[in-house]
């Protein structure tokens, strides 16, 4: 399995907080999710850490929801346009640009307290959730939600950040 090239923009200084190597931690979760969905080709993406004002502006402008949110994903390929990229992904030199994530650490922190999950589990949930959206997974329909949340749960459990059993249907939250 080839890797994921992640470029970062950190408007809030998140990556320098604490003594954790956030980029390494994020990469471990992304690679586990990539393996779980069976993606073998090289990928590239960006992760942008933003404040609540920027998160709210993006959410309002692109999703018509006037509130900050934990993660917003802009997938290059959403699966709805009928493009078959398989011929490209077989080329060992091809790197698939899957898109961009905009993450708001302060909203993730608030959610971790509201849901009683702890920051690490909530952050892990959010990064895997966003990554799956960039790979054409969604949770609008119940069967899609079951598949997507099942993948998230498996990845988080394997990493040591399990979803609680009562969260599997709704994805998170008690």
Curated annotation (Swiss-Prot):
Its main location: cytoplasm. It is an enzyme of class 3 (hydrolase). Gene3D superfamilies: Metalloproteases ('zincins'), catalytic domain. Belongs to the endoribonuclease YbeY family. Disulfide bonds: none annotated. GO terms for cellular component: cytoplasm. Binds 1 zinc ion. Its EC number is 3.1.-.-. It is found in: Cytoplasm. The keyword Transport does not apply. GO terms for molecular function: metalloendopeptidase activity; RNA endonuclease activity; zinc ion binding. Keywords: Cytoplasm, Endonuclease, Hydrolase, Metal-binding, Nuclease, Ribosome biogenesis, rRNA processing, Zinc. SUPFAM superfamilies: Metalloproteases ('zincins'), catalytic domain. This is Endoribonuclease YbeY. It comes from the Bacteria. Its cofactor is Zn(2+). It comes from Lactobacillus delbrueckii subsp. bulgaricus (strain ATCC 11842 / DSM 20081 / BCRC 10696 / JCM 1002 / NBRC 13953 / NCIMB 11778 / NCTC 12712 / WDCM 00102 / Lb 14).
């Amino acid at each position: 399995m080839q890797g994921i090239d992640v470029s970062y923009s950190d408007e809030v200084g998140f990556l320098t907080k604490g003594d954790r190597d956030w980029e390494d931690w994020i990469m471990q979760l992304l690679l586990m999710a990539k393996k779980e969905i069976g993606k073998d080709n090289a990928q590239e993406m960006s992760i942008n850490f933003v404040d609540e004002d920027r998160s709210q502006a993006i959410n309002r402008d692109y999703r018509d929801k006037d509130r900050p949110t934990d993660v917003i994903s802009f997938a290059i390929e959403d699966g709805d346009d009928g493009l078959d990229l398989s011929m490209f992904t077989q080329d060992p030199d091809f790197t698939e640009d899957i898109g961009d994530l905009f993450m708001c650490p302060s909203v993730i922190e608030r959610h971790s307290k509201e849901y009683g999950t702890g920051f690490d589990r909530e952050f892990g949930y959010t990064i895997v959730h966003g990554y799956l959206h960039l790979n054409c997974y969604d949770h609008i329909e119940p069967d899609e939600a079951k598949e997507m949340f099942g993948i998230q749960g498996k990845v988080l459990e394997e990493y040591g950040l399990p979803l609680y059993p009562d969260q599997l249907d709704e994805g998170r939250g008690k």
